Amino acid sequence: MMRAKLAGYLERTQVVFNRYPASDNSLPALYARAIARNCSGKCADAMGDVDQLLREKPDNPYFWELKGNLLFWVGKHQEAIPALRKSLKLAGDESLIQAELAQALLATEDHAVLEEAIALLRRANALDDDNSMTHHQLAKAFYMKGQYPQADLEAAQAHFVEGNVKQAQIFAKRALVKLPRGSPEWIRAEDIVNYKEQT
C-alpha cells in the first residue's frame, strides 16, 4: 500500500495509470489512482475510488484521510470534517491528520470551532514542530481570534521552518512588541529575531 501511495503522490498521472490500469481493482491500485486523480484535479473520479476503498476497508484511517482531503480540496470543508474525524479516531495521535482536521475546521470560518482547531494544532506541533503548515494554520486561528501577537509568532515560526529567516524575523519582531516580556512566547520570538544564518 505504501508503494501505491507514494506512486499516487509522486509519479505523473499517466505513469500511475499505466502501472495501475483501470482493469486492476486491487486496493493498492484503487488507492494509487484515487491519489493521482486528486493530485491532477479529477476529484470527482477519485471519490468513486475512495468510496470503493472504504467499502472494502472501512477501518483504514488513511482511506478516510484521503476522502477528507478530496472533499476539502473541492471546497466542501464542512463535509470533509466527519471523514477527517473518523480518520483521526482510527489513526490515533497522527500529527498530519490532526493538522488536516484543524485546517478543515478553520476553513469553515466558524468561530465556534477555533478552540478545537487550536488544540489539534498544538497537539500536532508537540508531535512534529517542523511542519510549517501547522504553524501557518495556528497563525490563521489566532488571527481569527484577534490574538495578533500569537498569530505573528506562529507566522514567524512557519517562515523559520521553511528557511525564510528574514520573513520570520519580520513577524517575530512584530510579536515581540506585544507579547509579555520574558514569557515563553516572547522568548521564542526573541530567539528567531536573534538567529544568525550560517554562512
Region annotations inferred by a language model:
Residues 37, 71, 105-108, 142, ...:
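Residue at a conserved register position within TPR or TPR-like alpha-solenoid repeats
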Residues 40, 74, 108-111, 145-146, ...:
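Structural motif corresponding to the intra-repeat A-B loop/turn of tetratricopeptide repeats
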Residues 144, 155, 161-199:
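Terminal, low-structured helical/coil segments at or just beyond the last alpha-helical repeat
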Residues 1-83, 181, 191-194, 198-199:
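Extracytoplasmic and endomembrane cell-envelope/extracellular-matrix remodeling and assembly machinery
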Residues 32, 66, 100, 137-138, ...:
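Canonical tetratricopeptide repeat
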Residues 27, 61-62, 78, 95-96, ...:
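Helix-start (N-cap) detector for alpha-helical repeat units in TPR-like alpha-solenoids
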